[in-house]
Amino acid sequence: KYIHSFPINKEEVSLAILSNKINLKKIINIVHKEIKKKMNQFLKKNRNKKIVVLDIPLLLENKINKKEDVLVYVQSKNSEILKRLSKRKNFNKKLFKIFKNIQLPLDYKRKKSRFIIKNNFTKKTIIKKIDYILDTIS
């Protein structure tokens, strides 16, 4: 009903999500099955690596992390996130709020994480913190 092209057009997906809450659940289910499959392929391919970094949206929400994973929470000011996202083509504030609402509380994510990086959007401080994390877990 909403998707009319392949590869899938982001605007069509956005319209489907905004039109019906059930569509969001269906889309998340489809996308995260694929994410889990790709993640497992990636981990298998890199199983001999000392450290593997994954950046997966809704990792905790979809329970696709393992107990022994080292979680790193990247903390950013909401105003900065919104400012950066609003610069993107086709940014939709309603969609942003919908996705924000399906996420676990930030305090929960912080508590589950072994490390926290305060993202002030400067490369130097982030690299310094990443180096510290790598030294600590190596």
Language-model segments: which ranges?
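A general structural signal for well-ordered alpha-helical segments in protein cores
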Residues: K10-E11, L24, K36, N78-L82, ...
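Amphipathic alpha-helical segments that mediate coupling or scaffolding at interfaces
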Residues: A16, I30, R84-L85, F99
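ATP-dependent NMP and nucleoside kinases share a basic, alpha-helical "lid"
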Residues: K38-N46, I51-R88
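Residue-level signature of catalytic and energy-coupling elements of molecular machines
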Residues: I27, V53, I117
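Short beta->alpha linker loops
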Residues: I8, I30-V31, S76, N101-L104, ...
